[in-house]
Regions:
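Conserved divalent-metal-coordinating catalytic cores
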Residues: 1-213
Length: 213
């Protein structure tokens, strides 16, 4: 199966193929979303999720969108993610970031490179209205082939939309380590991700969080 993006000009009756890429179809662990037993859901999505399950992820790296857009040094944020990735030394982390992860236009999202995310096991893009408009998310297209090969999960979350959740209270109340840039927060703890391809639902769960420093 393949996903095809195209444009059509009705006046000229012309068709233009923009891109074509294989659909995600590999076999993966998929348990659906179980009874969470009162555990805290910090992120929730209702579309375009990659089916799969992650348990006992020790780290969540979060980009504060207010800090990111209040500083013009976007590429320092991206390189800071690379530094954290290097320090992980084989430990996996969940990456949560506003806009289009990997965009060449830093106004649309963090211009991180895929080799700076080699220890990332899950990417969450946040659709947060900014100055009256909602940046279009990438839905994982910037790194699609790499995500498929490395079994990296993906989900988009849209602030303010029904069946979507960004628990800002959790991100504010829990302690974090500041990364190489003030926009980068590192949360230590135990996280799980459940993404059900059949219902197109995805959640990130806090199983118990702490921070050093």
């Amino acid at each position: 199966p393949a996903d095809i993006e195209f444009a059509y000009e009705p006046l000229d009756d012309s068709f233009c193929l923009i891109q074509s890429r294989p659909c995600w179809c590999q076999t993966c662990e998929e348990e659906g979303i179980p009874d969470l037993g009162g555990k805290r859901v910090i992120l929730k999505a209702d579309r375009m999720v990659t089916p799969g399950v992650l348990h006992n992820i020790p780290c969540l790296v979060y980009i504060d969108h207010l800090q990111y857009y209040s500083n013009p040094d976007f590429f320092k944020v991206a390189r800071g993610i690379g530094e954290i990735n290097e320090q992980m030394k084989g430990q996996k982390f969940i990456f949560v970031s506003p806009g289009r992860v990997g965009s060449s236009n830093p106004e649309l999202g963090v211009p991180v490179k895929y080799n700076e995310l080699t220890n990332c096991c899950c990417i969450v893009e946040l659709g947060i209205p900014r100055l009256g408009f909602m940046p279009e998310l990438s839905y994982g297209t910037h790194f699609f082939s790499d995500l498929a090969v490395d079994s990296v999960l993906y989900m988009p979350v849209f602030e303010g939309e029904s069946n979507n959740l960004i628990d800002q209270e959790w991100f504010t109340e829990n302690e974090w380590e500041e990364g190489p840039h003030p926009a980068i927060r590192i949360y230590r703890g135990n996280f799980s991700a459940y993404m059900d391809g059949e219902s197109n639902q995805g959640v990130i769960i806090d199983n118990g969080t702490s921070a050093e420093g």
